[in-house]
């Protein structure tokens, strides 16, 4: 029943469980009773959670911050769809917050956009902000756009995740994943809660086989970036391009790239050659691979936490993470509205607590 049943899955199934299941396993080792019970595909608030929420959160030392990628929510990750979630705006200062652990990302993005006059659209990354460290595919977009604003923000309030730092804005030429920052509550402060230390980074992580990590950069050219008339081209080489469509998966683009090279269908002049893909061609190749590693259950399930009640000003919502299924006849799912996140409303000051007349009183 419940969590215990999950923990008895065969060994090969463990490899395909998602981040949330590992969170449950880690908590299972921390507590003597289960963190939650899964019933009707819904993770219910457990007695442990209620206990922690009632009177045990005495210091932010008990919080562990985790970056969660939006692609786990089933949002469309192709470049045309993803870029529609971002927009330029002035008058809002950028915010940066750190997080301690995160997921590996299937899709990351890297933008180099200029205005028509040649000036830069995006600010350079401040000192200490490095690219997201674990991306299977990096979608590198170069091009031009009006860029009507000082910074590029996420229209739905999510963060841009960098290397253990999450920012509200996009930095020039710095790889990021879309996500939010969540907090795990521990019964007491634990320094060694995350037992796996960060991998020792080789000089070039993408080529060192010992790192067990491989990343592929896919290049695009954009015109009218950030407008409703944006046009994207997938770059085969500096003179050969393919018109980009939302239905193209990274695996399909890589196969397309290989086909252009081996079949000799590249530009052999000084002019630009642009190909268009036949609408009847199935482009869903490889889409299952990512979701096999991300899936948690075959149906939707919700994760509830008392943290949402600490500084809640809007109606309470649950964060829903769902596996997206694609049939052979379907293209990628349309852009989904991500849940408005209360995670960003949690103040990051220290809690100062004292016991007065037998009651725990905390102030910020």
From Swiss-Prot:
Keywords for this protein: Cleavage on pair of basic residues, Disulfide bond, Glycoprotein, Ion channel, Ion transport, Secreted, Signal, Transport, Viral ion channel
Signal peptide positions (record): 1-32
Annotated site residue numbers, Cleavage: 324-325
GO terms for cellular component: extracellular region; host cell membrane
Glycosylated position list: 40, 204, 228, 238, 257, 268
One annotated GO molecular function: channel activity
Highest taxon of the lineage: Viruses
Keyword Transport in annotation: yes
Disulfide bonds: 108-135, 121-147
Family: Belongs to the filoviruses glycoprotein family.
Protein name: Pre-small/secreted glycoprotein
